Amino acid sequence: MKFDGVRPTRVEVYLDAITHNFREIKKIVGKNVKIMAVIKGDAYGHGASYVAKFLEKEGVDYFGVATTEEALELREKGIKTPILIFGYTPPTQLRQIVKHDLTQTVYDIKYAKELEKESLKQNKRAKVHIKIDTGLGRIGYIDFDLAQKEILEMANMRGLILEGIYSHFAAASEDDRDYCKEQFDKFMNLISSLEKKRLKIPLKHIANAAAILNLNYSHLDMVRPGIILFGAYPSKRVERKVELRETLRFTTRVVHLKDVPAGFFIGYGKSFVTKRKSVIATIPVGYADGLDRRLSNNYKLLLKGKYVPIVGRVCMDQCMIDVTDVEGVEIGDEVVIIGTQNNETVSVESMADKIETIPQEVFSRISRRVPRVYFYDGIKIGEVNYLK
């Protein structure tokens, strides 16, 4: 049956592939290094709650998310594993942080005092990880003398547990290994200074996906894999140390077919004109679903194992493909946007290259109006339609 009760445009998520990738990462870092699975951005478009449930079964040590809302969604779905919020949480939401045992990133003593005040109000202690900016220029302490002074003060706060300290590489996926080493040395020098003051922080972490593969010295107490959990490498310049498996297919189906003559215009702005008698198919996927408009007249999808070009501009909800050279196309035939069909593949990396971005952005821009259908070892185990 070509159509079922789920929207024709969908993402199939392979949870067994995600768990495989997780195990591959464990092989690299060894049993003494903890793993924080980074599942922000709805697990890079894969659906955070399902992914978290399966990684929790695999024994993941921590989850990393960007916002309070992402963390609360996981708690509401029954996730018990510790969750670190990488970003800023407004003071108005600190009650939720404490109530749901979430770990907050901190890089300011005034903020730490606000969090401690809320913790004591609830008769609890909130876990915090201190963020150090060693060269990314985003958030975190850049004055290391101030950092040391305030961290030592935080360590004595009754309402806080100073569990972790971390930083983030700016160029681990690039060729600038010297800058990575410079960042790492800054981070370790601060930690050494704190330890001389008799403060030993349990979880020290700096390694993202690229550093896991390229910079073994940076693994420390915990690593933070993100995109490699989801089957893609962070860049072409990282070592291919692991056998990553494809974790999703982004697909749709043909909903309209028409025969048109040569000289027929397709799409907004008349940006494509047929050069011969052609068969044009319409598929119900557009830029509101995550198919980038820059792929207009500039990319090929898969139909019956053959590459077919997008013709005309990608619309908000639909686009057109030229299927003239594919025999026997029918309404309901599957079209692959990202993934494999009949041993041919449209990779997330190739799409990212075409629009001059990274796989992380391509995955995370697949919108929530696209249902996620979940499989394990080829068996469908569930689906999520965010709009129901």
Curated annotation (Swiss-Prot):
Top EC class of this enzyme: isomerase
Domain of life: Bacteria
SMART domains reported for this sequence: Ala_racemase_C (SM01005)
InterPro entries, sorted: Ala_racemase (IPR000821), Ala_racemase/Decarboxylase_C (IPR009006), Ala_racemase_C (IPR011079), Ala_racemase_N (IPR001608), Ala_racemase_pyridoxalP-BS (IPR020622), PLP-binding_barrel (IPR029066)
Record flagged with keyword Isomerase: yes
Pathway noted in the entry: Amino-acid biosynthesis; D-alanine biosynthesis; D-alanine from L-alanine: step 1/1
Catalyzed reaction equations: L-alanine = D-alanine
Cofactor(s) this protein cannot do without: pyridoxal 5'-phosphate
Keywords noted in UniProt: Isomerase, Pyridoxal phosphate
Family assignment from sequence similarity: Belongs to the alanine racemase family.
Primary role: Catalyzes the interconversion of L-alanine and D-alanine. May also act on other amino acids.
HAMAP family per record: Ala_racemase
Protein name: Alanine racemase 1
Species: Caldanaerobacter subterraneus subsp. tengcongensis (strain DSM 15242 / JCM 11007 / NBRC 100824 / MB4)
